[in-house]
Regions:
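Conserved glycine-rich cofactor-binding loop
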Residues: 12-14
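Conserved glycine-rich Rossmann-like NAD(P)H-binding loop of the short-chain dehydrogenase/reductase
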Residues: 26-42
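Residue(s) in the substrate-gating loop at a strand-loop-helix junction
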Residues: 137
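C-terminal helical subdomain
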Residues: 178, 198-239, 244
């Protein structure tokens, strides 16, 4: 066991859930944040050690500050932040996305990462160490109509935000990495305008695959910073759609 503390947002499902479980198995004390207590409590039963549940809407800066303050009061430090909270909206393209939905996606997917990162960053500067992992997306690197302008814009910004941490705080011993997964079989797929088949989901990257990538980052020597990681399914639907008539049977 170690005495390290990891705070995971979006811990109630998907990548956040599996990251919390795997970090706890590595000996971390995990703090699980998300909007739904029932989901977080369920995840906590799968974690090793003594996980702490903190209800949080990352789009509310005052709520983020409150939870951060409570974590520091309890543990005095945060060694790893995994910012995994994210959403998209079913009506997501230019012809049908509302102002309200656009703002909601930006507030959670971008502002929420900024709020958590900024607070944790200042504490990590005091500690002279720390790892920040922001769960971005394939859409943070490649513009796609599949994800729409709000999500794509937010994730591109997350990548830039993450690298700016390395530029400004690397000399404090702080490392930041944006993980950019392609299609991952998480609940966010259920928000797609066109449903994803179970057969296709099985071929996608799984949440536990992304979690293993986070574990890899935590195991690197502190002198090593992986700025960005792009992950995609071997059977990549984006590639397949372009090669439909050329793929050998």
């Amino acid at each position: 066991m170690n005495d390290k503390i990891a705070w995971i947002t979006g811990a109630g499902s998907g990548i956040g859930e599996h990251t919390a479980i795997q970090l706890s198995e590595e000996g971390y004390t995990v703090v699980l944040s998300g909007r739904t207590r029932e989901s977080l409590e369920k995840v906590s039963t799968k974690c090793q050690g003594d996980p702490l549940v903190k209800i949080l809407d990352v789009s509310d800066p005052e709520e983020v500050k409150r939870v951060f303050t409570e974590i520091i009061k309890e543990f005095k430090k945060i060694d790893v932040l995994v910012a995994s909270a994210g959403i998209n909206t079913p009506k997501r393209n230019w012809h049908n996305i509302s102002h309200q939905d656009f703002d909601k996606v930006i507030k959670i997917d971008l502002n929420g990462i900024f709020y958590t990162n900024q607070l944790v960053l200042e504490k990590m500067k005091e500690q002279k160490s720390g790892l920040i992992v922001n769960i971005s997306s394939w859409a943070g690197k490649y513009v796609s109509t599949l994800t729409g302008p709000a999500y794509t814009s937010a994730k591109h910004a997350v990548n830039a935000l993450t690298e700016s941490i390395n530029m400004e705080a690397g000399h404090f011993g702080i490392r930041a990495c944006a993980i950019c997964p392609g299609e991952v079989a998480t609940p966010i797929l259920d928000k797609r305008p066109i449903p994803v088949s179970d057969e296709d989901k099985k071929k996608m990257v799984q949440p536990e695959d992304c979690a293993k990538t986070v574990i890899f980052l935590t195991q690197l020597h502190p002198r090593v910073c992986i700025n960005e990681i792009t992950i995609s399914p071997t059977w990549n639907r984006d590639y397949v759609s372009r090669l439909t008539d050329q793929i050998p049977s």
